[in-house]
């Protein structure tokens, strides 16, 4: 599920959670994605507002330079599938927040989507929730054996590192700061695990 919105920046309405007396910078915790730079600033700005209306931020990505696209990936807090209405609510909130703070000086496009089944692993809770499933991981810092691209079974994570069992049987601990990206591999087991259970009669 995805929607797009284009904006030229600036806006008159300050969201209630950014009124005077509310902090405009929030620390990243184990339930929020870890970002740096402009993506980190945007994550700090929008995550509290999303949480206040029942959503969780999964990832912020900025693509392009001339007219950048701000990609927001989110979940519902209750873990039910994200709908088009949800994407629209998220889009309106994010646009209002970014128009107030104006972290991007030029025109930009907003893209809001669900994480999908083969989702990125960006938070400690993602690594723990999907323990037992296969993931592909790209590293900025190689492992002791010199590898920067791994495929293995997720074993879980804490605030410092994620643990993965490789196909060779070796278990490795990967500091979050060394992980460039990590994403679940689409398998039958993952599809079954993420199927929405039938509604009770």
Curated annotation (Swiss-Prot):
Query: What is one Gene Ontology biological process annotated in the Swiss-Prot or TrEMBL record?
Result: translation
Q: Which domain of life is it from?
A: Bacteria
Entries under InterPro entries matching the protein: Ribosome_maturation_RimP, RimP_C, RimP_C_sf, RimP_N, RimP_N_sf
Please give the coiled-coil regions recorded for this protein: none
Q: Name one GO cellular component term.
A: cytosol
Note whether Cytoplasm occurs among the keywords: yes
Q: Major location, coarse class?
A: cytoplasm
> What CDD domains has UniProt attached to this entry?
YlxS_C (cd01734)
User: Does this entry carry the keyword Nucleus?
Assistant: no
Pfam families membership: DUF150_C (PF17384), RimP_N (PF02576)
Q: State the UniProt keywords alphabetically.
A: Cytoplasm, Ribosome biogenesis
Give the subcellular location.
Answer: Cytoplasm
> Record's family?
Belongs to the RimP family.
NCBIfam families named in the record: PRK00092.2-5
Q: Which HAMAP family match?
A: RimP (MF_01077)
Main role? Answer: Required for maturation of 30S ribosomal subunits.
State the name under which the record lists this protein. Answer: Ribosome maturation factor RimP
Q: Which organism does this sequence originate in?
A: Acidiphilium cryptum (strain JF-5)
Q: Which gene encodes it?
A: rimP
């Amino acid at each position: 599920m995805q929607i797009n919105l284009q904006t030229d920046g600036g806006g008159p309405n300050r969201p209630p959670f950014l009124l005077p007396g509310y902090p405009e910078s929030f620390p990243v915790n184990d339930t929020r994605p870890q970002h740096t730079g402009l993506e980190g600033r945007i994550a700090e700005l929008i995550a509290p507002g999303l949480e206040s209306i029942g959503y969780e931020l999964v990832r912020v990505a900025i693509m392009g330079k001339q007219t950048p696209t701000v990609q927001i990936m989110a979940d519902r807090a209750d873990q039910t599938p994200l709908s088009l209405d949800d994407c629209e609510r998220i889009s309106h909130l994010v646009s209002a927040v970014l128009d107030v703070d104006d972290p991007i000086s030029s025109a930009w496009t907003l893209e809001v989507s669900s994480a999908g089944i083969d989702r990125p692993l960006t938070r400690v809770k993602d690594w723990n929730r999907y323990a037992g499933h296969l993931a592909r991981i790209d590293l900025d810092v190689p492992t002791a054996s010199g590898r920067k691209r791994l495929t293995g079974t997720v074993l879980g994570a804490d605030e410092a590192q994620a643990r993965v069992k490789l196909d060779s049987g070796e278990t490795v601990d990967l500091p979050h700061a060394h992980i460039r990206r990590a994403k679940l591999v689409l398998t039958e087991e993952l599809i079954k695990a993420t199927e929405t259970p039938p509604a009770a009669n």
